[in-house]
């Protein structure tokens, strides 16, 4: 009986780890739909550290679980002109170090895993208010209302071991569609965004188990104040809802109802060199990680 309970609990831990991996879409990231000049490249290096409490459903005999995640990300993006629209195409490759510590049936337990995460390809199109501009035209551009859409694909190439609970990759495709709006009034910029996250099934959870997940809804809003060229301060919130999972066809009551708030500041180091500092914090988390995340990003424009 104890062995069966242990197996069931281990599968529940897998589902919680899935929630932690999907939580990256819930980060507060300002200025996702700002216009960019065509023909310009952006190379970014990002380090992020997340720490905090991990929340499981009541069927899991785990207590006082704390998690630490160190993430290193390299991304390359290029501004494009497609049909007169401003388009940003980007590719990001993460490397993560995940560690969990807590009590299992009252006894100390821990786990750690390092490796490459799932690469993400993102295509963002500004549908209104941000035409494709050359770098020379972009310098005199005054944004007002911008409507944009983006589509991201998470490719299951990250490190995944079907015999392990903790994994850096998800072993499934993830698609994220978003529609966003930004409006500029003087030095102030207001943003809102809605999206849906879809994921394919994973048929290799602990070798023989099948994981499915309902779509997850995403809402985000924020406000930014521009001090001058390249210098701004922003804050906002994000919300994830839904995403119930099925394990071997049995639906679980583990939908997300997670709120996060955050702030970011960006400033230039020199011409073509930009730094950004971000901090996000979990306000409420039903399933997954109630984490605080600190991120430092450097971007080279050329």
Model-predicted regions and their roles:
Residues 97-212, 254:
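Outer-membrane pore/translocation modules
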Residues 22-44, 129-145:
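Outer-membrane beta-barrel biogenesis signature
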Residues 39, 66-74, 114-121, 145, ...:
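Residues that define the transmembrane beta-barrel architecture of outer-membrane proteins
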Residues 43-49, 89-97, 149-155, 192-198, ...:
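Transmembrane beta-barrel strands of outer-membrane/channel proteins
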Residues 209-302:
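Outer membrane beta-barrel transmembrane domains
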Residues 53-54, 84-87, 131, 187-190, ...:
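Repeated loop/turn-to-beta-strand initiation elements of outer-membrane beta-barrel proteins
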Residues 50-71, 109, 162-169:
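Surface-exposed strand-loop-strand hairpins of Gram-negative outer-membrane beta-barrel proteins
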Residues 45-47, 74-78, 121-127, 151, ...:
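Residues on the lipid-exposed face of transmembrane beta-strands in outer-membrane beta-barrel proteins
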């Amino acid at each position: 009986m104890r062995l069966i309970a242990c197996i069931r609990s281990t599968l529940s831990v897998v589902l919680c780890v899935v929630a932690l991996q999907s939580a990256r879409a819930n980060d507060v990231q300002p200025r996702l739909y700002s216009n960019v000049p065509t023909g310009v490249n952006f190379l970014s290096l990002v380090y992020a550290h997340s720490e905090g409490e991990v929340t499981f459903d009541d069927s899991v005999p785990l207590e006082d679980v704390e998690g630490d995640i160190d993430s290193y990300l390299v991304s390359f993006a290029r501004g494009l002109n497609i049909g007169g629209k401003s388009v940003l195409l980007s590719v990001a490759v993460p490397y993560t170090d995940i560690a969990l510590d807590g009590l299992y049936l009252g006894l100390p337990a821990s786990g750690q895993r390092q490796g490459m995460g799932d690469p993400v390809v993102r295509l963002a199109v500004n549908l209104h208010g941000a035409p494709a501009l050359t770098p020379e035209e972009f310098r005199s551009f005054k944004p007002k209302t911008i409507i944009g859409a983006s589509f991201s694909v998470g490719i299951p190439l990250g490190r995944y071991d079907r015999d392990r609970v903790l994994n850096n990759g998800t072993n499934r495709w993830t698609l994220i569609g978003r529609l966003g709006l930004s409006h500029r009034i003087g030095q102030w910029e207001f943003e809102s965004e809605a999206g849906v996250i879809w994921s394919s099934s994973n048929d290799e959870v602990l070798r023989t188990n099948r994981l499915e997940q309902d779509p997850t809804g995403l809402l985000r809003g924020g406000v930014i104040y521009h001090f001058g060229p390249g210098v701004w301060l922003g804050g906002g919130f994000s919300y994830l809802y839904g995403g119930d999972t099925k394990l071997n066809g049995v639906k679980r009551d583990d939908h997300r109802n997670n709120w996060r708030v955050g702030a970011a500041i960006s400033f230039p180091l020199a011409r073509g060199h930009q730094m950004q500092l971000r901090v996000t914090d979990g306000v409420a988390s039903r399933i997954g990680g109630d984490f605080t995340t600190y991120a430092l990003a450097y971007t080279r424009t050329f």
